[in-house]
Amino acid sequence: MLEDFLSLSKSNQDLTPDQMQQAITWMLAGMVPEEEIGRLLLSLREKGESVSELVGAVRAMRMMMTPIRTTRVGLLDTCGTGGDGTKTFNISTATAIVAAAAGATVAKHGNRKITSATGSADVLSELGVKIDADRSVVEACLDELGICFCFAPLLHPAMKQVATVRRSLAVPTLFNYLGQIGRAHV
């Protein structure tokens, strides 16, 4: 199903936004075997993901996500990329807490560790935060407290289609960047 896209990537050619959107849509709809997903993700990583590919991937993600509604404006999201390879502490979560304490409105987006030592969800869970709160609770926290945690599996349920392959690859892929640029429509 992704053969044409894989061929382009292996030829060091960038996929167009429409091509990438189609590829990600098929992946997230569960239409593509994991081996094929892995081959394309690794090929894109080796070539270097392009802006056009990230644009297409963000479009696909936004079409399939659960949005968060808020009355707040000027939101900050400190979503990290995960997988820094150096086993550093989770600075994006610490940044979210400090920024909110300083008065910023923060919609912290994140997940459990996939390719890093700790994910935001791991850190917050250890601190006693209910990371899998309903969307209405997340929205109320943001509106009333000025900070919330947007747990990726609840806002991006289709990502479960690529979770196993991402873990098996054990290296960051374009999905690590989508959290930063394709946030929960807050």
Region locations from a protein language model:
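Short acidic/polar capping segments at secondary-structure boundaries
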Residues: 112-113, 129, 154-157, 182
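General beta-strand structural signal in soluble alpha/beta enzymes
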Residues: 77, 106-110, 131-134, 149-151, ...
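A glycine-rich phosphate/pyrophosphate-binding beta-strand-loop-alpha-helix module
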Residues: 41, 89-145
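Self-splicing inteins and homing endonuclease
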Residues: 58-82, 135-165
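Acidic, glycine-rich active-site loops and adjacent beta-strand->loop/helix elements
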Residues: 80-85, 110-116, 155
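Acidic, glycine/proline-rich low-complexity segments that act as flexible tails and inter-domain linkers
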Residues: 1-87
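Conserved small/polar residues in nucleotide/adenosyl-binding loops
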Residues: 184-186
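A generic local secondary-structure boundary/capping motif
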Residues: 111-113, 137-139, 160-166, 171-178
